[in-house]
Curated annotation (Swiss-Prot):
Localization per record: Cytoplasm
Stated family: Belongs to the acyl carrier protein (ACP) family.
Entry keyword set: Cytoplasm, Fatty acid biosynthesis, Fatty acid metabolism, Lipid biosynthesis, Lipid metabolism, Phosphopantetheine, Phosphoprotein
Name recorded for this polypeptide: Acyl carrier protein
Domain Carrier, chain residue ranges per copy: 2-77
């Protein structure tokens, strides 16, 4: 797993209190990991802070899974 993926996974595990094994590429933050809309906003803010990037609102709405987050951050960082 890439450094970006490792860092994203750590943020997801810490913010959502889920087991690391549940955070897979296609794991939906809401459907699979139990996040609500506030959790997803907090995740986006944590990604922005961790990676020093800005995620516009329209892009944030497309980040629904762990894989989406890793892909977006990899392209933006």
């Amino acid at each position: 797993m890439s450094d970006i993926a490792d860092r994203v996974k750590k943020i997801v595990v810490e913010h959502l209190g889920v087991e690391e094994e549940k955070v897979t590429e296609n794991a939906s933050f809401i459907d699979d990991l139990g996040a609500d809309s506030l959790d997803t906003v907090e995740l986006v803010m944590a990604f922005e802070e961790e990676f020093g990037i800005e995620i516009p609102d329209d892009a944030a709405e497309t980040i629904q899974t762990f894989g989406d987050a890793v892909k977006f951050i990899s392209e933006a960082a």
